[in-house]
Each structure stands twice: as C-alpha cells, then as structure tokens.
Amino acid sequence: MSYSGSYYGGLGYGCGGFGGLGYGYSCGCGSFRRLGYGCGYGGYRYSCCHPSCYGGYWSSGFY
C-alpha cells in the first residue's frame, strides 16, 4: 500500500489496493472494465487485466 500511495496515488487514481478515487482495489478485470475506468489512468478505459496495460506507470516492477 505504501508503494501505491507513492506511484499511483500521485496520479490521483491509485491501483492495487489503494485507489485514489476508489477505483483501484485490486485491478480486477470485471469491476474496472465494467466501470470503464482502467486503474492508474482512470477515465481512459485501460484494461485492468494486466499490469502492462498501464504502460510506464507500472514499469517499476510489473512492466
């Protein structure tokens, strides 16, 4: 959660248990894709199925 606050929290969306706007609980395929808000880049419909969908945002250890 500490890393989430730093990286994703800084984006204002969060991902993987943090959720800056309440969307990033665990980046599950179903929940977020149904909402149309990919975690990490909320509002742009990034597939939250895989970490790599965030491009460079998760490059720290998931890309």
Curated annotation (Swiss-Prot):
Keywords: Keratin, Repeat
Domain of life: Eukaryota
Disulfide linkage: none
Pfam families: KRTAP
A cellular component annotation (GO) from this entry: intermediate filament
Assembly notes: Interacts with hair keratins.
Assigned protein family: Belongs to the KRTAP type 19 family.
Function: In the hair cortex, hair keratin intermediate filaments are embedded in an interfilamentous matrix, consisting of hair keratin-associated proteins (KRTAP), which are essential for the formation of a rigid and resistant hair shaft through their extensive disulfide bond cross-linking with abundant cysteine residues of hair keratins. The matrix proteins include the high-sulfur and high-glycine-tyrosine keratins.
Name of the protein in its database record: Keratin-associated protein 19-7
Species in which this protein is naturally found: Homo sapiens
